[in-house]
Amino acid sequence: SASKGAVIAMTRTAAKELGARGITVNAIAPGFIETPMTDGMTDQQKEAILSRITLGRAGTPEDVAAAVAFLAGEGGSYITGQVLEVSGGIVM
């Protein structure tokens, strides 16, 4: 989508501009995450999405938080300009 393309472009541009200062810039692209926002979906709608997820389950806010913590911590110190898909494989 255009909005996803814009996020990718902004992430890469900011990473290039800020890298010389030792600042890393990355983005998280969450897939289907079970939150109060998804509570309004029907079981049929949820199943249609879940059937496309390689890992066979919805993600959790904790899954996204773990990715953020990784990128913000020492493990992510040499990663910049990347978009990390936290999607259970739905995007493959």
Language-model segments: residues:
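A short C-terminal helix-loop "cap" of Rossmann-like NAD(P)-dependent dehydrogenase/epimerase domains
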Residues: 39-53
